[in-house]
Amino acid sequence: MFTINAEVRKEQGKGASRRLRAANKFPAIIYGGEAAPVAIELDHDKLWNMQDKAEFYGEVVTLVIDGKEEKVKVQAVQRHAFKPKLTHIDFVRA
């Protein structure tokens, strides 16, 4: 099972997302279930190594956000067109 540390995003929008990517992070979102959607930021290098494994896409992933654990599944992954970079991930609550 995969465990990922995440932080709630303080800023949203194109400029904020670009600043995140420049800081070696990238935006993501958690949605589904009864709770409201949550915009988060993730560390790029840690996720890049995890996303190479097929199990990352099929198993339940644990996100640790501000000390609380949230069980999610990967719904969609967006990658840069020609650079080895993740640009966004959608998670759905499990």
Curated annotation (Swiss-Prot):
Q: Which gene encodes it?
A: rplY
Q: What is this protein called?
A: Large ribosomal subunit protein bL25
The domain of life for this entry's organism is Bacteria
Keyword Ribosomal protein: yes or no? yes
Quote the subunit structure annotation. Answer: Part of the 50S ribosomal subunit; part of the 5S rRNA/L5/L18/L25 subcomplex. Contacts the 5S rRNA. Binds to the 5S rRNA independently of L5 and L18.
GO MF entry, a single one: 5S rRNA binding
Q: Which InterPro entries match?
A: Rbsml_bL25/Gln-tRNA_synth_N (IPR020056), Ribosomal_bL25/Gln-tRNA_synth (IPR011035), Ribosomal_bL25_short (IPR020055), Ribosomal_L25_dom (IPR029751), Ribosomal_uL5_bac-type (IPR020930)
Family from the record? Belongs to the bacterial ribosomal protein bL25 family.
Q: Which UniProt keywords apply?
A: Ribonucleoprotein, Ribosomal protein, RNA-binding, rRNA-binding
The record ties this protein, via Pfam families, to:
Ribosomal_L25p
Leader sequence range is none
Q: What is the lineage of its organism?
A: Bacteria, Pseudomonadati, Pseudomonadota, Gammaproteobacteria, Enterobacterales
